[in-house]
């Protein structure tokens, strides 16, 4: 069960609320809080991902701040592997490595603890987040995993905003899996 059928896709899509004109006019914001507070939808998603990734022999799940933490921590617990947060600059308390990425107007950075994978070179890491748009943050996250001597076995996203091209950008760095392409 590693591919959703059309009914399962629709079930998940129906559990995600669209907020028009947020955070600015013309944007259709995908609000996953409605999926998170629906125990059947959230449970189905985590069970589906657990089934998919059980065979990957993972060492860690890495989640991108902040919604990637929700899915990543739940999935890591079910898979009985470690969870590694990838955070915005200045949010992690110990020694970090950082990766810059471009925004519409400027740059931002994400960080990971330098010893996130407990110095186990080649740790098998799944990267997860709720959504991929332009791919800048996800691309930086894959590079961070590599810089910390991990191996990103796959990058997983619940939603892929296809027209923005981020999935293609990230798939050049790591295998990619998206559940819902919209």
From Swiss-Prot:
CDD domains: PRTases_typeI. It catalyses: AMP + diphosphate = 5-phospho-alpha-D-ribose 1-diphosphate + adenine. Its main location: cytoplasm. PROSITE patterns: PUR_PYR_PR_TRANSFER. Keywords: Cytoplasm, Glycosyltransferase, Purine salvage, Transferase. Belongs to the purine/pyrimidine phosphoribosyltransferase family. This is Adenine phosphoribosyltransferase. The lineage of its organism: Bacteria, Pseudomonadati, Campylobacterota, Epsilonproteobacteria, Campylobacterales. The gene is apt.
